[in-house]
UniProtKB/Swiss-Prot annotation:
One of its GO terms (biological process) is fucose metabolic process. The chain crosses the membrane at residues 58-78. It is a single-pass type II membrane protein. This is O-fucosyltransferase 24. InterPro entries: FucosylTrfase_pln (IPR024709), GDP-Fuc_O-FucTrfase (IPR019378).
Length: 579
């Protein structure tokens, strides 16, 4: 605040105070300010001129100063607003549902309770080993992004997507198929019920085949019944996991689907059959099942897992793809949760997804050993002796023979060496799906040591976010499926139904990169101590040159599943490039 003394011969000395905004004071140098306030050497007549309230020049000058002050303040406010708006635009965006997001990428409502959750999430991210500037949802990538591709020159080859050779989805059914559809869709005499069992991806395979069988029989399909999983106690119904309306509407021109039997047939006991052989053909189904429908026209099938032949006529192969990739979508709430986690993983650039098969029962079933220590080998061997029925085929082979034959899952150490050899950057963000590994955190130590940014769904979910799905193993698996499918690079340590399903889905959506470990040929190099690291990496890259998700013809080998290899039945070549 500045102070002026005004002398008047008729009045006592008075002190006048003028408030000056801090912005103006700060913008004036101290020397100038000192002169402006305390310069007593100014001429008295000048001082009298300024403080004569009756002088019109004073009013004009005052208005001029006020105008300058107003412009300065307005300009300052505009600049302040622009700066804060730009900052907020970086810290806050909207998710797919229109909800605001914090700078961590988590959807939230502006309430004190939720702000506490966000704060807790920040603390959790630090506990997980995430650096302060690497909270989930940040908009600045930790990777250099030339041309918007999410990688620098050094890591370009690893993140580079395979050449899809112009293949795109095309489900053009034949004239004969469409003609038959008109007859089938008016059918009301035969109803097919199916009970599907196993884990999520086993259920999906059976649902796909159930639709195809209903089409072959010309029957109405009742929405499949999901058998309660005795191991996990999952009581989810079809509509809990999958989008029922999507399922019905997409297949409306292929198979008539109803949620329940008609009232006239509800009380009837369906004819039940579980004798379908492996590799059953459409001819076998047409000759065997029509006579199995009961008097009311209801047939119940069980144990469909991998029974229907993988080699079907082209139209039925297209129908398989239509069910697997277009009709069988996850329910809205499952999709929302999975998509949200995928967005958090991608918030700082591209990410890798791994499906790790390191659970105790996997080592027992495969006849392999984890490679952790003799302690864990003994645990697996004891369990295998107790339950010999769990061991899969080729039980005469030793665990070492199985490993060298490429029949064993990769352990964390092998996964780490493979990723490093293929050029995965150390700062790559990795999402891993799968059950609790035998050995817990110790089993994952080789991975976390080399790739510190390793997360699963529990690491990146907000507190209580996964609680509604806590006892729903199939829904948890569906969330993993979504995050893995949306990744930039995917790899399964041991094939399996989920790995195969994701491989086919990623191919159908544009041949996104998948690493298929060439276990049988690469493991000898893993134990060859005479190789330098450079030589090792060169050999591993050479082995996997054609195993990175490029289009591959299903018909090149008999018995391949079209939902894993959708070319050529379900995808057309738009560029006339041959495989």
């Amino acid at each position: 605040m500045g102070t002026w003394k005004n002398k008047n011969s008729n009045k006592k000395n008075r002190v006048s105070y003028i408030s000056v905004p801090a912005q103006i004071i700060n913008s004036v140098s101290s020397s100038s300010l000192h002169k402006f306030l305390d310069n007593k050497s100014s001429k008295k007549n000048t001082s009298k001129f300024f403080f004569n309230l009756r002088n019109p020049k004073l009013w004009a000058f005052s208005l001029f100063l006020l105008s300058i002050l107003g412009i300065s303040l307005r300009l300052g406010l505009c600049l302040s607003h622009f700066g804060s708006g730009d900052h907020e635009s970086q810290l806050q965006s909207s998710d797919s549902n229109g909800s605001p997001k914090s700078h961590m990428g988590f959807a939230y409502i502006r309430s004190s309770t939720t702000q506490v959750e966000i704060s807790n999430a920040k603390d959790r991210s630090l506990d997980m080993g995430v650096e302060k500037n690497e909270t989930f949802g940040g908009h600045q990538s930790h990777l250099i992004i030339p041309n918007g591709n999410g990688h620098d020159d050094k890591n370009y080859d690893f993140w580079k997507q395979p050449d899809g050779l112009g293949y795109k989805p095309c489900l053009d059914f034949s004239i004969e198929y469409r003609r038959e559809s008109k007859k089938i869709l008016v059918e009301r005499r035969k109803y097919l019920m199916v009970v599907v069992s196993g884990g999520l991806n086993q259920q999906k395979i059976q649902i796909v085949d159930a639709v195809v069988i209903a089409r072959i029989l010309g029957a109405v399909l009742v929405v499949p019944i999901l058998q309660i999983n005795l191991i996990w106690g999952d009581e989810s119904e079809f509509s809990d996991i999958f989008d029922l309306e999507q399922f019905k509407s997409v297949l409306a021109n292929d198979v008539k689907i109803v949620s329940l039997l008609p009232a006239s047939k509800v009380m009837t006991r369906p004819s039940e059959d579980g004798s379908m052989p492996f590799n059953a053909s459409p001819q076998w189904i047409r000759s065997h099942y029509p006579k199995r429908f009961n008097r009311e026209g209801v047939l119940l099938l069980r144990r469909l897992d991998s029974r229907l032949s993988k080699d079907l006529p082209s139209d039925l192969q297209k129908l398989r793809c239509k069910v697997a990739f277009e009709a069988l979508k996850f329910s809205p709430r499952v999709m929302e949760m999975g998509t949200k986690l995928a967005e958090r993983m991608r918030s700082k650039g591209p990410y890798i997804a791994l499906h790790l098969r390191m659970e105790k029962d996997v080592w027992v079933r495969t006849g392999c050993l984890s490679g952790l220590s003799s302690k864990y080998d003994e645990i697996v061997n004891i369990e295998r002796i107790k339950r010999p029925e769990l061991l899969t085929a080729k039980s005469s082979m030793t665990s070492n023979e199985r490993k060298l034959a490429g029949l064993c899952p990769l352990n964390a150490k092998e996964v780490t060496r493979l990723l490093r050899a293929l050029g995965a950057p150390r700062d790559a963000r990795i999402y891993w799906a799968g059950g609790e590994p035998l050995g817990g955190k110790e089993a994952l130590k080789p991975l976390t040591s080399e790739f510190p940014h390793l997360y699963n769904k529990y690491d990146i979910a907000l507190p209580l976010e996964l609680k509604p799905f806590a006892k729903r193993a199939s829904i948890m698996a569906a969330i993993d499926y979504i995050v893995c499918k949306e990744s930039d690079v995917f790899m399964a340590s041991h094939g399996g139904n989920m790995g195969h399903a994701i491989q086919g889905h990623r191919a159908y959506e544009g041949h996104k990169k998948i690493i298929t470990p060439n276990k049988r040929h690469m493991l000898p190099y893993f134990v060859n101590s005479s190789l330098t690291e450079t030589e090792f990496e060169k050999m591993i890259k050479k082995l996997h040159r054609q195993s990175l998700g490029q289009p591959e013809l299903r018909i090149s080998k008999a018995g391949r599943d079209v939902t894993k290899y959708p070319v050529p039945e379900c995808m057309c070549n738009q560029s006339n490039t041959t495989i």
